[in-house]
Amino acid sequence: MAREDLSIQAPDGACRTSVFTPTKGAGPWPGVIFFMDGVGIRPVLQSMAQRLADAGFVVLLPDLFYRAGEYDPIDVGALFASPDGRKALTPFIGATDNHRAARDAESFLDHLQDRSDVSGTKVGTTGYCMGGGISLTVAATAANRIGAAASFHGGSLATDSEMSPHLLVDQIQGRVYIGAADNDGSYPPAMAARLIEALMAAHVDHRHDLYVGAAHGWTMSDFPVYHEEAAGRHWHALTALFMETLQ
């Protein structure tokens, strides 16, 4: 694993961050920001970031829970062991939101811009679960710096909240990819239709794929709902998106 652990000064403090580079070959390579899911930084996300890096990218994985202070990796098994298991996430998820993460992203983008091993003027973003909405939000708030943005099993992408990503899509300049599960209470069909309508109205270059048979969290190999076939399809879509837009 070609990994560098560092601290990036973000608006509300020092953000623990890992940067992954390809294990083979010589750079520079295009930069990508990997926005985590709501379970926090843990080995599966680090492995995913390295896999993406090995496709030919410099991947920055920030800990968006930095405002909550230091914490041990969350026990994913305990989260799903009982109905109350997910309550452990409450203080962490409350430490960030789409708007705060978008402000943080300016610092992440500056870091990538200053690295000698990063090429190009545009960066890609990808996000999972809560990170999906953050990925789309950053594609809007930093539109001139984002070449492509992806969301996989992202929730609450088109709601009545003032933080809803669909309200900002008219600012997006890059390409957008949405990978949605067909069994996801956080992103039901009516919400998907609302997001697609907003993307079309804003003339955003986008693709919206439904992963049939997949549930919320299907890309995460430490989740009970992990779907190997759909996860493989997600990798193909993600790497193709960035290879077509960031090279």
Language-model features, listed with the residues they occupy:
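N-terminal cap/leader regions of alpha/beta-hydrolase-fold enzymes
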Residues: 1-247
